């Protein structure tokens, strides 16, 4: 018999999640409710293809939609026009030098069709804690000293789970996404999780992956050796113009 209610999580952050395959069909992917955003629970969730997503006036909701949106890190779609703009860009890209500013901007930058944000203060503090533990990372795009775009997410093993991105200037988020995809591809990470389908992600080359296949990939990739600690030294500072020559679709 199909379930019509999500699982209720208890207060123990080490308690296991129910299998993601048991998520509801309506609303698509809702698996569990409650618990907290402790680092142990978040890492356990992501390692099993589950992520939190809820509004300020809701309890913590945990999701694993079917299908799942992913980017193959060698197949980000960049238009010829955008590549030409990149080749003449003076912007630079860094990693893990402005994580808190990126997550704050993702929470506060206005978005078409959205009223308010799901990146609550509680969510921000949870991901900042993961960042301080070396599990959450950001790619940041600068125009001089001004932050004009960025993306952040969670890394476990060799799997990156994207959370949100922003633009304070046209193209900023696209540059951040391209920089992240290129970095992951260079390191041999094949997938970037994009969570939930939307037209913008599809236009950039995101693909629908059946949840069962996604979970198989997650299980494989999270078991592989990670990049420990901060990425700032490993990544350094790179010109955004180099992305115009990147071998992405």
Curated annotation (Swiss-Prot):
Catalytic activity as recorded in UniProt: N-terminal L-lysyl-[protein] + L-leucyl-tRNA(Leu) = N-terminal L-leucyl-L-lysyl-[protein] + tRNA(Leu) + H(+); N-terminal L-arginyl-[protein] + L-leucyl-tRNA(Leu) = N-terminal L-leucyl-L-arginyl-[protein] + tRNA(Leu) + H(+); L-phenylalanyl-tRNA(Phe) + an N-terminal L-alpha-aminoacyl-[protein] = an N-terminal L-phenylalanyl-L-alpha-aminoacyl-[protein] + tRNA(Phe)
InterPro entries: Acyl_CoA_acyltransferase, Leu/Phe-tRNA_Trfase, Leu/Phe-tRNA_Trfase_C, Leu/Phe-tRNA_Trfase_N
Keywords per UniProt: Acyltransferase, Cytoplasm, Transferase
One of the record's GO cellular component terms: cytoplasm
Organism domain of life: Bacteria
Gene3D superfamilies assigned to the protein according to its UniProt record, in alphabetical order: Leucyl/phenylalanyl-tRNA-protein transferase, C-terminal domain, Leucyl/phenylalanyl-tRNA-protein transferase, N-terminal domain
Enzyme class, broadest EC rank: transferase
Broad class of where this protein is predominantly found: cytoplasm
Subcellular location: Cytoplasm
EC number: 2.3.2.6
GO biological process, one term: protein catabolic process
Annotated GO MF terms: leucyl-tRNA--protein transferase activity
Transferase keyword on record: yes
Role according to the record: Functions in the N-end rule pathway of protein degradation where it conjugates Leu, Phe and, less efficiently, Met from aminoacyl-tRNAs to the N-termini of proteins containing an N-terminal arginine or lysine.
Family affiliation: Belongs to the L/F-transferase family.
Name of the protein in question: Leucyl/phenylalanyl-tRNA--protein transferase
Organism whose genome encodes this protein: Xanthomonas axonopodis pv. citri (strain 306)
């Amino acid at each position: 018999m199909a379930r019509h209610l999500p699982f209720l999580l208890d207060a123990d952050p080490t308690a296991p999640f129910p299998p993601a395959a048991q998520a509801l069909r309506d609303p698509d992917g809702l698996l569990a409710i409650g618990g907290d955003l402790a680092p142990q629970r978040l890492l356990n969730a992501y390692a099993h293809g589950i992520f939190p997503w809820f509004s300020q006036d809701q309890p913590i909701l945990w999701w694993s939609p079917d299908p799942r949106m992913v980017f193959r890190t060698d197949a980000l779609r960049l238009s010829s026009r955008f590549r030409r703009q990149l080749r003449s860009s003076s912007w630079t890209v860094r990693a893990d030098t402005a994580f808190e500013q990126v997550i704050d901007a993702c929470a506060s930058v206005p978005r078409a069709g959205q009223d308010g944000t799901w990146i609550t203060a509680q969510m921000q503090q949870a991901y900042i804690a993961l960042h301080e533990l070396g599990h959450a990372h950001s790619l940041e795009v600068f125009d001089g000293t001004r932050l004009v775009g960025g993306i952040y997410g969670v890394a476990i093993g060799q799997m990156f789970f994207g959370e949100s991105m922003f633009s304070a200037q046209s193209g900023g988020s696209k540059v951040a996404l391209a920089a992240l995809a290129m970095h992951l591809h260079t390191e041999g990470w094949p997938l970037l999780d994009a969570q939930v389908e939307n037209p913008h992600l599809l236009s950039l080359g995101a693909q629908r992956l059946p949840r069962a296949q996604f979970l198989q990939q997650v299980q494989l990739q999270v078991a592989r050796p990670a990049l420990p600690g901060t990425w700032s030294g490993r990544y350094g500072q790179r010109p955004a113009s180099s992305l115009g020559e990147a071998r992405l679709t």
